[in-house]
Amino acid sequence: MLVSPLPDVGMCAPHPGGEEMSNFKPDGRRTVIPRIITDDVAGLVRFLKTVFGAGGEPQSATPTEMTMGDSVVMISDGSGAREAMPAFLYVYVQNADETYERAIAAGAESIEKPTDMPYGDRRATVKDSWSNIWQIATYRER
């Protein structure tokens, strides 16, 4: 059995020779789920739908879960026990240039125009109206 040296902290990956727990997270979930805390859940949801084609609807009693490709991003209201906190996320999309243009049209500020990176990504960076930073990338072979 795997035992964490820290109290109440589970292991997210098996160690060599250790037992692997198969039910430590719900089926279909990734190990890491980003969570953005904002004072404007509905506005951020609209932005994600417009720019990234994200799926999901604002929720009031639970975090809003937005699907983006094969990933989920949780969005929570920052007016309760948690203060609004921006995030920095790297998102792969079909076309970085078009997604960048949609972000700018939706009110985002350009930080970096689409640029070919030496590691094979075409990448752009924007800052949305809630101070989240989005690096938008499309992989192109080197």
What are these regions (language model features)?
Residues 60, 119-121:
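Short, small/polar residue-rich loop motifs at catalytic or cofactor-binding pockets
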